[in-house]
């Protein structure tokens, strides 16, 4: 078991570890960290709750990703739509595990789409991902995308 997984399972460590890491990152004036999660490289921002969970505990929707992988293994999946791809975690993990599946990643928020692009660039061997800076809907129209910014993350 990885040390980060142990920190996630022991309640006192689960509370102390993030605080210490966050304080250390502030002292070093460093918020962005390169990390590996499920075989993919990610640029993670300690201020973002999803990134923080991956960075500190090697954990983000692990059960959902495992379930999705099981479905992919049982069936031939030709296309996978990652709608609201965020930073591309699902796209990248599925791409790594299933290189013959064409992955279509949709992320409408420009700043988040830039983060998706950065994470894709950290994994240059994954060639089966097509990315789009669009939102998807059942209505064909052009809308202005608004995102709430809080503590420098969306």
Tell me the role of every PLM-derived stretch.
Residues 1-154:
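Phosphate/nucleotide-binding beta-alpha loop and adjacent structural elements of enzyme active sites
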């Amino acid at each position: 078991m990885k040390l980060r997984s142990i920190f996630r399972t022991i309640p006192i460590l689960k509370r102390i570890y993030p605080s210490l890491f966050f304080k250390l990152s502030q002292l070093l004036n460093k918020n962005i960290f390169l990390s590996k999660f499920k075989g993919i490289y990610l640029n993670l921002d300690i201020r973002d709750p999803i990134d923080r969970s991956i960075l500190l505990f090697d954990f983000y929707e692990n059960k959902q990703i495992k379930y999705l992988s099981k479905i992919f293994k049982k069936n031939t999946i030709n296309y996978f739509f990652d709608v609201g791809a965020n930073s591309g975690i699902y796209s990248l993990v599925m791409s790594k595990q299933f290189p013959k599946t064409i992955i279509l990643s949709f992320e409408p928020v420009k700043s988040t789409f830039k983060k998706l692009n950065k994470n894709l660039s950290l994994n240059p061997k994954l060639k089966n991902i097509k990315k789009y800076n669009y939102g998807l809907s059942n209505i064909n129209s052009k809308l202005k995308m608004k995102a709430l910014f809080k503590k420098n993350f969306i």
